[in-house]
Curated annotation (Swiss-Prot):
Family under the similarity heading: Belongs to the universal ribosomal protein uL13 family.
CDD domains: Ribosomal_L13
Function: This protein is one of the early assembly proteins of the 50S ribosomal subunit, although it is not seen to bind rRNA by itself. It is important during the early stages of 50S assembly.
Organism: Synechococcus elongatus (strain ATCC 33912 / PCC 7942 / FACHB-805)
Descriptive protein name: Large ribosomal subunit protein uL13
Length: 151
């Protein structure tokens, strides 16, 4: 019987990647980001360990959705008080807090446990093209969200 490979915490290399979300489709972009955060793109992937990389997303305000989702997709949050449900459309939330759209999409694709919360801290989302992580020298991660597109 083969023994499962288990990397030590010190042996795990964590890279920094920057992703440009301009004109990218939300769901397909979030899927790829979650895969990199989880570490599934590495041969050292282990399901119960954090083997993933850091991801910086820029131009979050320019992410797109297909069809009529801009006006029909709803984001809900609750204050915890009676009658405290707030409902917002994609278009309105994109104007107000575009970072939250990508954060919620990626968070829903991560495990719902302590490991998922730890992985989520490695996601950094910014509205514009600038980010404060130049010191980490992030590599550009190109994600193609439509077959045949050069996005």
């Amino acid at each position: 019987m083969n023994k499962t490979y288990l990397p030590s915490q010190g042996a795990i290399e964590r890279n920094w990647y920057v992703v440009d979300a301009a004109d990218q489709r939300l769901g397909r972009l979030a899927t790829e980001i979650a895969r990199v955060l989880r570490g599934k793109h590495k041969p050292t992937y282990t399901p119960h360990m954090d083997t993933g990389d850091f991801v910086i997303v820029i131009n979050a305000d320019k992410v797109t959705v297909t069809g009529r989702k801009a006006s029909q997709k709803l984001y809900r949050r609750h204050s915890g008080r009676p009658g405290g449900m707030k409902v917002e459309t994609f278009a309105h939330l994109q104007q107000r807090l575009p970072e939250r759209i990508i954060e919620q999409a990626v968070k829903g694709m991560l495990p719902k446990n302590a490991l998922g919360r730890q992985l989520f801290t490695k996601l950094k989302v910014y509205r514009g093209a600038e980010h404060p992580h130049q010191a980490q020298q992030p590599e550009v991660l190109s994600i193609q969200t439509f077959a045949g597109d050069d996005n």
